[in-house]
Amino acid sequence: MNFRLSYLVTAFAVAALSVSAASAQKTGLKVFISVDMEGVAGVVNSDQVTMGGHDYNMARKWMTEEANAAILGALDAGATEIVVNDSHSTMRNLIAGDINPAARLITGSPKTLGMMQGIDETFDAVIFIGYHARAGSADGVLDHTYSGAAVHALKVNGRETGESELNALIAGHFNVPVVMIAGDATLCAQVKKSLGPDVVTTETKEAIGRYAAKTLVPSESQKLIRTNTAAALKKLSVFRPYKPSAPYVVEIDFLYSHQAENASLVPGVERVSARTVRYTQPDFINAFRMFRALVTLANA
């Protein structure tokens, strides 16, 4: 009788310790930050976002500083683990030696998940920095979607989709919400409609044209990014992952007819017009990988 009682007490104690350990693991705030360049304050021209361009080094400095502002905001909110993914072009733009050492940096390419490399279900929130309006936006600074040389428009389940929505879908696959997005005013208006009104936005500039803007000076943009990142992370309960219902019907409208012709060589891809192809996938990660493959093939 005493042995059985002792056994039960021990079992309950072990169970309690296990629950306590699990709870302790969940108390840390883990944040993923994807950093693009076209939406950074002060950036308005292709020369600034192209490696080797005349103003590139200054623009990458501003990009790095906006990433650091988001890191500081995450730390202000109590983040215990932060991963930053360089998400522009070559994905070798952020100045590694200048990134806040509280974060870990993912740099270089190719990467399977591209702008979202490193995301998984262990993260609590996603932040987008330096993002831009989708291709074809009337008032978007350096607007494009994934490949300015190939993609004229992109739809997922009939919804207009830019890089913000595309990457939010990847985060949603892992049940992680996007909570704060920084970029130009047109981008901010777009994501409020597509991802929902709760997403916190930071307007870094307002387009005057595709290559001109009324912009915050970098130091002011960085202050706002830090403040808004912290504010968003302190109210995580209001956010939900972006998860349209599967299956995922993806429609790519290319710039040129030969690009659609190349893409339609892939089994399962239907050419629905001269420049447009369509395919369906039950899993969004596979849908995204197919998208990348088709864009690569289109550019061949």
Question: Would you name each region that the model predicts?
Answer:
Residues I170-V178, A182-L233:
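Active-site rim beta-loop-alpha module in soluble metabolic enzymes
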Residues Q25-S46:
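Mature N-terminal segment immediately following signal peptide/propeptide cleavage
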Residues M1-V9:
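Bacterial N-terminal signal peptides that target proteins for export
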Residues P218-A300:
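C-terminal accessory domains and tails appended to enzymatic cores
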Residues V14-A22:
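C-terminal segment of classical bacterial N-terminal signal peptides
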Residues H54-D86, M91-R92, A102-R104, N228-K235:
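Alpha/propeptide regions of enzymes that mature by internal proteolysis
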Residues G148-F174, G183-L187:
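Active-site glycine-rich loop that binds ribose-phosphate moieties when present
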Residues P101-I119:
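A glycine-rich helix N-cap at a beta->alpha junction
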